[in-house]
Amino acid sequence: MMMDPDSAKMQDYSGWSFGFHMPPTSSTNLLPQSMPDDLSNGPDSPDSTGKDGKKNDDRVKRPMNAFMVWSRGQRKKMALENPKMHNSEISKRLGTEWKMLSEQEKRPFIDEAKRLRAIHMKEHPDYKYRPRRKTKSINKKNGAPIPFGNLDTKTPSYPTLTTNWNATNQYIDQFRFAPYPTTTVMDQIPFSLTYPVHSVPTDNSSPSQFQPSPMSTNFAGSYLTPKSESSPVGSDSTVGTVDSSQFRAYYDHTKDQMMYPYSIELTHAQNIQNALSQSHVTS
């Protein structure tokens, strides 16, 4: 029978005494150690047990009261009748039954508790009741543990965001922009101030009748050359030069917003020239 050479090598290696043996780990060679008694239940616990399984005698038990004397036999009876009932439920029912008993029914158990207390005081004259410290239970919310119980678990309140676009615009306009004029404010503004009207000259009107309005910035009709009042439409006399006085009366470059920067520079230049000419004359 033919064998694969690799499998043959593996078989040879497995036969060696030192081949493929894992060293013992820390968990395999550790011997089981018993937990110290002081870490398991503690000396103050009445249910703490020693190495031999016996209860620790260093802890002096508290003497039983009348209810404990009565419930000692009733607990066993109820546990036998209800084997699946939890111990806390048994204690709750026993407490309810104890409250329903009369003083005559409780009297023998009260006397027995007094007798046990007297014996306890004789055996342990320096006894002092030391209740066990209860560990603070961690606050839980919705089943999830909270690491710090003193933290405020209230939900922080945030301002609700509105989806109304008009309300958002009012909030923005309050800090950045002036409010838009309403229709009542717009109605009070004259129509000539909001929409300047320019009248185009006709053949039967004089150029002096068409002065630009003070608020007018539109100069589309300002450069139209007026025609002669006496010349008919389409005659040859319409072509010619226009008197400069009529043109100045019709068009004033100082009122033109586009020409205003140039007119200021021209005025400064004329003033400088006049000042220079006067200085030459005086000299």
UniProtKB/Swiss-Prot annotation:
State the source organism's domain of life.
Eukaryota
What is the reported tissue distribution? Expressed in AWC and AWB olfactory neurons throughout life. Also expressed in the IL1, IL2, URA, URB and OLL sensory neurons, the AIM, AIN, AVK, RIH interneurons, and the motor neuron class RME.
Q: Where in the cell is it found?
A: Nucleus
Give the compositionally biased regions (Basic and acidic residues). 49-61
Please note every region of biased composition (Low complexity): 205-216
Q: What happens when the gene is disrupted?
A: Animals arrest at the first larval stage of development with an unattached pharynx. Able to form neurons, but with defective terminal differentiation of both AWC and AWB olfactory neurons, OLL and IL1 sensory glutamatergic neurons and cholinergic neurons including IL2, URA and URB. RNAi-mediated knockdown results in failed transdifferentiation of the Y rectal epithelial cell to the PDA motor neuron.
Keyword Membrane in record: no
User: Disordered: where is this region?
Assistant: 24-63, 202-239
- Listed GO CC annotations: nucleus
- Taking the record's annotation, the residue ranges forming a coiled coil are none
| Feature: compositional bias, Polar residues | 217-239
Q: Which GO terms describe its biological process?
A: brain development; IRE1-mediated unfolded protein response; negative regulation of transcription by RNA polymerase II; neuron differentiation; neuron fate specification; positive regulation of transcription by RNA polymerase II
Q: Which GO MF terms are attached to this record?
A: DNA-binding transcription activator activity, RNA polymerase II-specific; RNA polymerase II cis-regulatory region sequence-specific DNA binding; RNA polymerase II transcription regulatory region sequence-specific DNA binding
The record's annotation in Pfam families points to: HMG_box
Could you tell me what this protein does?
Probable transcription factor that regulates the lineage progression of embryonic blast cells and controls the postmitotic specification and differentiation of neurons. Cooperates with additional factors to direct the differentiation of the olfactory neurons, functioning with the transcription factor ceh-36 to specify AWC neurons and with the LIM homeodomain factor lim-4 to suppress AWC terminal differentiation and promote AWB neuron differentiation. Plays a role in the terminal differentiation of glutamatergic and cholinergic neurons.
Its quaternary organisation is: Interacts with egl-27 and ceh-6. Interacts with ceh-36 and lim-4. Interacts with wdr-5.1.
Name it: Transcription factor sox-2
Organism this protein belongs to? Caenorhabditis elegans
